[in-house]
């Protein structure tokens, strides 16, 4: 008899989870067991108001590689986004500066946070977990651009974006960022290009 009970309880729990998941996605809250902005199939996508790109608040947290940061910023602007850039190069502890910037942007309730060159390892590990959890609880999707080391907890970020400008079929950077911000279906790992459609760099 206990066997049937478990089966029933499991089904009930699954149903409850589905209901909670559905409601939380609609409310724009934190989804269960998945990153904010991590919709991988069209079936999971909840109807959302497609914000105009220029009304998306995109925060980009810099890295020590300012050249790559600049390419990414230019590509976002070329694609109709208006990113706010928070540089960290030249600061005493760049990962710590980046974490502070993420927490500031989470408080400002931006649409998406793009973190360049994140290194979730060693002394930075626990601090990054706390910071990314703060963004998650605020319901803000996080995309990791050219990460050095990512968190093992995949619920803490929506996707990694790796720039590959030699790939002709890579996703335009602005499209990837806008898609994640709007919770469109996307892969966990996205190869992006900073070269605009016009063929000019």
Labelled PLM ranges:
Residues 85-96, 119:
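Short beta->alpha junction loops
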Residues 114-116, 139-149:
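Short beta-strand elements of ligand-binding domains
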Residues 26-33:
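Bacterial signal peptide processing site
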Residues 170-198:
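A charged, well-structured terminal subsegment
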Residues 1-19:
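N-terminal export and membrane-targeting signals
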Residues 124-139:
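Catalytic-core regions built around general acid/base machinery
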Residues 144-163:
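Glycine-rich, charge-decorated loop segments at or immediately adjacent to ligand/cofactor-binding or catalytic sites
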Residues 99-111, 131:
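Short, well-structured alpha-helical segments in soluble
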